[in-house]
Curated annotation (Swiss-Prot):
GO cellular component, one term: endoplasmic reticulum
Gene: CYP75A1
Protein's name according to its UniProt entry: Flavonoid 3',5'-hydroxylase 1
Alphabetized UniProt keyword annotations: Endoplasmic reticulum, Heme, Iron, Metal-binding, Microsome, Monooxygenase, NADP, Oxidoreductase
Subcellular compartments: Microsome; Endoplasmic reticulum
Binding site for heme: 443
Enzyme class: oxidoreductase
Pfam families in the cross-refs: p450 (PF00067)
Length: 506
């Protein structure tokens, strides 16, 4: 609604600028573009996106098909809404769509795209990706900090047990942010970044949520560059203010870490390794800005996307108690009630893994994936896609497509336990389920995300019974759109320990 109001107020400005701008728009006369809505002069389809663009685009796809083309402001945008369409763009034409389009988020939040998420596909991006995979996110590196995850979960279980004894409710997002930020902090900086839950961790969570929210907005200035200076929605002002907060926090972490280098002699952490190996054979060397931008990526994406998936999964199980009970029964049979769940137990818990896949399907953390842009014109399924066309893959729509999934609005983990669906893997090769994207620009933290969701969710379900606070009549399952898909109303719950009491002592 706010976007429509702002667009309406600016219509006269757009129309005056139309004649000038239209001469700058590249023509595709005679080319067979994909179908799509016509939109308005200059502003194009921007008003059609509404407050929930992933939902609006899914509705449009029912009319226009698997591949759509929209004029959004002065920019062309292709939207893929089926597994085959996603595969065509992200696998067959992966290299042509390996870059990110310029946008205010990259400029004002990500240190002018000096990070890993928004960086140009080239030597610096490859170096950032290589270091992250080798020393934190990849298979062997991930195994090396399994004890950190286990220890931090021990602290979380103790805290939740204490809250249960005192009759306090658990705010799930706050609890998860505290634990996951401390996990990542220990790997990257050799320290827990938060000692106690309270104002500091809540401020950090609010900052992360705001970043993910405003970075996901369809910013008018990104699509009509000549109007960017006006900042009609106030988005860039918010981004700059938020960046100052994050930069102050990251600079403090960076400086404190440098001052204690001698204490880690012989036991380097992730930041030590990045600073020591921040160059490559192509002459690329990471600056302090690059390193801070990388820390920003890992802290924000590492805490928000996984915590969001876990929160959605718990909410679905509380709404469907039979699923919760079945998951607990599986764990009781495999693990018992006299010890905690271990990461090594997870391969023996197919129902838990099915719950995680079903959550990735119905509530993907990034509903529209991160946008890409075409380096050259290309043909997709017979349609012409011009150079510099932005690409959005509607992961949310794919997960709710009745042509792909039976009863897609139903939360049903059973669908992943038998038949072809039991072989579907969320790591980017099965395009029916691509919560982390696919291709070269797939989320660098895919492995870590899956491990964190399965392990933390499994531990929470095994360790506690869950119910809503007494005054909550019905669980709110509405979404809040952003770069990551949050619950509109954060989940709060009353928990009761279900294992023997010494398990909750870290």
């Amino acid at each position: 609604m706010m976007l429509l109001t702002e667009l309406g107020a600016a219509t006269s400005i757009f129309l005056i600028a139309h004649i000038i701008i239209s001469t700058l728009i590249s023509k595709t006369t005679g080319r067979h573009l994909p179908p799509g809505p016509r939109g308005w002069p200059v502003i194009g389809a921007l008003p059609l996106l509404g407050a929930m663009p992933h939902v609006s685009l899914a509705k449009m796809a029912k009319k226009y098909g698997a591949i759509m083309y929209l004029k959004v402001g002065t920019c062309g945008m292709a939207v893929a809404s089926t597994p085959d369409a996603a595969k065509a763009f992200l696998k067959t034409l992966d290299i042509n769509f390996s870059n990110r389009p310029p946008n205010a988020g990259a400029t004002h939040l990500a240190y002018n795209a000096q990070d890993m998420v928004f960086a140009h596909y080239g030597p610096r991006w490859k170096l950032l990706r290589k270091l992250s995979n080798l020393h934190m996110l990849g298979g062997k590196a991930l195994e090396n900090w399994a004890n950190v995850r286990a220890n931090e979960l021990g602290h979380m279980l103790k805290s939740m047990s204490d809250m249960s004894r005192e009759g306090q409710r658990v705010v799930v997002a706050e609890m998860l942010t505290f634990a996951m930020a401390n996990m990542i902090g220990q790997v990257m900086l050799s320290k827990r970044v938060f000692v106690d839950k309270g104002v500091e961790v809540n401020e950090f969570k609010d900052m992360v949520v705001e970043l993910m929210t405003i970075a996901g907005y369809f910013n008018i200035g990104d699509f009509i560059p000549c109007l960017a200076w006006m900042d009609l929605q106030g988005i860039e002002k918010r981004m700059k203010r938020l960046h100052k907060k994050f930069d102050a926090l990251l600079t403090k972490m960076f400086d404190e870490h440098k001052a204690t280098t001698y204490e880690r002699k012989g036991k380097p952490d992730f930041l030590d390794v990045v600073m020591e190996n921040g160059d490559n054979s192509e002459g690329e060397r990471l600056s302090t800005t690059n390193i801070k931008a990388l820390l920003l990526n890992l802290f924000t994406a590492g805490t928000d996307t996984s915590s969001s998936a876990i929160e959605w999964a718990l909410a679905e199980m509380m709404k469907n108690p039979a699923i919760l009970k079945k998951a607990q029964a599986e764990m009781d049979q495999v693990i018992g009630r006299n010890r905690r769940l271990l990461e090594s137990d997870i391969p023996n818990l197919p129902y838990l893994r099915a719950i995680c896949k079903e959550t990735f399907r119905k509530h993907p953390s990034t509903p529209l994936n991160l946008p890409r842009i075409s380096n050259e014109p290309c043909i997709v399924d017979g349609y012409y896609i011009p150079k510099n066309t932005r690409l959005s893959v509607n992961i949310w729509a794919i997960g709710r497509d009745p042509q792909v999934w039976e009863n897609p609005l139903e939360f049903n983990p059973e669908r992943f336990l038998s038949g072809r669906n039991s072989k579907i893997d969320p790591r980017g090769n099965d395009f029916e389920l691509i919560p982390f994207g696919a291709g070269r620009r797939i989320c660098a933290g895919t492995r870590m995300g899956i491990v964190m969701v399965e392990y933390i969710l499994g531990t929470l379900v095994h360790s506690f019974d869950w119910k809503l606070p007494s005054e909550v009549i019905e669980l709110n399952m509405e979404e809040a759109f952003g770069l990551a898909l949050q619950k509109a109303v954060p989940l709060e719950a009353m928990v009761t320990p279900r294992l023997q009491l010494d398990v909750y002592v870290p």
